[in-house]
């Protein structure tokens, strides 16, 4: 079996409400991180086969297959694929798992997992939530902070 390994990690600063990062597009922020990762690891962009991006609310500035846009903005070749995974708070971890699985099955040799969330551009629940009444009555739709407290 082929083993997958993580050869590098990079992250952006965490923004605060009305802080200095207000107005930076999530795709620009993610592509800066990917460019920094490529620089840090000295990986040639042509060696990257795929990019999977985790995002809990892929709409608005985070929509329209943001992963492919991030790949292009990062300087990866147009041949590099891009997909978005939504597992809410687990989205980025799922992106790591997907890249790892694709490497271990021999589907790709190298991939990048990235996550991004612009909590100021996209409101909790998205732009047009339509919650199921029965689930809403049971308080099914709560944030991860509240969920963690309950668990």
Name each model feature, range by range:
Residues 1-80, 114-151:
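Conserved "HGTGT" condensation-loop signature of ketosynthase/thiolase-family condensing enzymes
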Residues 85-116:
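Active-site-proximal alpha-helical scaffold in enzymes
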